[in-house]
Design a protein with these regions (language model features):
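Extracellular loop-to-transmembrane helix junctions
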Residues: 10, 33-128, 132, 239-242, ...
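Membrane-helix boundary/coupling elements in multi-pass transport proteins
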Residues: 73, 96-110, 212-225, 280-320, ...
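TM-loop-TM module centered on a large, flexible mid-protein loop between adjacent transmembrane helices
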Residues: 79-81, 86, 118, 235-301, ...
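Membrane-interface "cap" regions at the ends of multi-pass membrane proteins
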Residues: 1-36, 41-45, 57-62, 71-74, ...
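Helix-loop-helix connectors at the membrane interface of multi-pass transporters/channels
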Residues: 2-6, 79-82, 108-129, 161-164, ...
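C-terminal membrane-solvent junction of multi-pass transporters and transport-like membrane proteins
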Residues: 153, 321-332, 369-422, 452, ...
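Membrane-interface loop-to-helix entry segments
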Residues: 113, 126-182, 213, 236-240, ...
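Helix-loop-helix junctions that connect adjacent transmembrane segments
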Residues: 4-10, 46-47, 124, 156-288
């Protein structure tokens, strides 16, 4: 990696930026909109599902955190896969993560269109997607501080809104003003806590995982963070509190306020529940917050996709032109290329306005599975390398190596679940073809480089 290129990135993200980005990073469409599909599959037991998936996500982020604290680089786990596993692993994980972020960008833009239609049903989803596409990408071309400030305030809004919703919902329950249908017994009174059995919960796990996509954002910010040794461990350890407050507590209140079997699909259950309680003002405000959350996640994934493309270019796995960084510290070409591909979302929403979000969500989950498996496997190789060198790490992961194998087994189980679900099967079937395309592209890249390159130092260890 060119030190000059790396040095041109600005350390414009302060401790408050990193902490709030990490704290608010998982509050997005997966919680507010994706939850409707998981409720349909599992009922109240999705609360347990989010707890299980959140625990796996926490274990894996500790694995990534251990590597990032040792080497705070822009390529994140793609860099680590390249260095500790081999060149193709870095090539595959980097491009897969870039595609993942582009897909998440598309999903968030699709969701933004649905939220706008809550107020103005006549506005097509593609029009809303195009508007926010232009706005966010324009801002991201200015300076990394603008990204940090936007995410900081977006996260403040999301966090305060979630806490207010929990508080207001708890007040309604405690005072009995939420109506006769509101009761904690909603968690078990309607066909039990597992209305569709354990099978229902298992089938919902693939949808639940979508909510945790993008949780790796802290790793991408490492190269532009000040004092990464201090800020990054704090950001990682916050994940467990995010899960308990933003998912478990929120869903507990939601299910208590309204019977789960009356929550309609297509929109946000949160908005629908408060609207049904004659709290139209609260529902309108909540829809604004949910819209803010979707814009926030789109902003973050736009940032991630451009920085991953920059890292790939610095590794030689993408055209060198994408490694150029302007005087403001922005990888302009990487931002523009990522944006150009993301704009396909506008076309997708124009052709499939009602199915775009669901299709993109399943593709995102498949890409998440690949990336999380790569992170856990790369971490195994990272720890073995550190042990051979006789070095200890500053921020060791939990339960190594058991947690690595547990995370990988869980993610492979998600693929099995998706393959058994007709609506999700196509995403799983695309994975072998996608990896084959990456293998062909990698071989093409190697043949294009005529001069023989030195053997990768750590590849020789393999």
């Amino acid at each position: 990696m060119s030190t000059q290129e790396q040095g041109n990135l600005k350390h414009g993200l302060s401790n408050r930026h990193i902490q709030l980005i990490a704290l608010g990073g998982a509050i997005g469409t997966g919680l507010f909109l994706g939850i409707s599909q998981s409720i349909k599959l599992a009922g109240p037991s999705v609360i347990l599902g989010y707890a299980i998936a959140g625990f796996i996500a926490f274990l894996m982020m500790r694995q990534l955190g251990e590597m990032v604290v040792e080497e705070p680089v822009s390529g994140s786990f793609s860099h680590f896969a390249y260095k500790y596993w081999g060149p193709f692993a870095g090539f595959m994980s980097g491009w897969n993560y870039w595609v993942l972020n582009v897909l998440v960008c598309m999903a968030e833009l699709s969701a933004i269109g649905l939220y706008i239609q809550y107020w103005w049903p006549q506005i097509p989803t593609w029009a809303s997607a195009l508007t926010f596409f232009i706005l966010i990408n324009g801002i991201n071309l200015l300076h990394v501080k603008f990204f940090g400030e936007m995410e900081f305030w977006f996260s403040i809004v999301k966090i305060l809104a979630i806490l207010a919703m929990i508080g207001f919902g708890s007040y309604l329950l405690a005072t009995g003003t939420a109506g006769p249908q509101a009761s904690i017994s909603n968690l078990w009174a309607l066909d039990g806590f597992f209305p569709f059995g354990i099978e229902g919960l298992v089938m919902a796990m693939a949808v639940i995982i979508f909510a945790f996509g993008g949780i790796e954002l802290f790793g991408i910010t490492a190269a532009e963070a000040r004092d990464p040794d201090k800020t990054l461990p704090k950001a990682v350890n916050q994940i467990i509190y995010r899960i308990l407050i933003f998912y478990i507590a929120t869903l507990f209140v939601l299910f208590s306020l309204f019977p789960w079997n009356q929550m309609a699909e297509g929109g946000s259950p949160f908005v629908m529940v408060f609207a049904s309680l004659d709290s139209q003002g609260v529902a309108t405000l909540l829809n604004f917050v949910i819209l803010t959350a979707a814009v926030s996640v789109y902003n973050g994934t736009s940032y991630c996709s451009s920085r991953m493309l920059l890292g790939l270019a610095q590794q030689g796995n993408a055209p060198k032109a994408l490694a150029r960084i302007n005087k403001r510290g922005i990888p302009t070409n990487a931002v523009l290329v990522s944006a150009f591909v993301t704009v396909l979302c506008v076309l997708l929403n124009y052709i499939f306005p009602e199915k775009a979000f669901g299709l993109l969500m399943m593709l995102v989950v498949a890409a998440i599975v690949i990336n999380w498996v790569v992170i856990s496997w790369t971490h195994l190789k990272f720890r073995k390398f550190m042990q051979r060198q006789g070095q200890t790490t500053k921020f060791p992961s939990f339960m190594y190596p058991f947690s690595n194998y547990l995370c990988m087994a869980f993610m492979l189980g998600i693929l099995v679940v998706m393959s058994l679900t007709p609506d999700m099967r196509v995403a799983v079937m695309m994975i072998p073809g996608w990896i084959l395309c990456l293998m062909v592209a990698y071989q093409f890249k190697r043949r294009k480089i005529k001069t023989e390159q030195p053997v990768h130092a750590l590849e020789a260890d393999m």
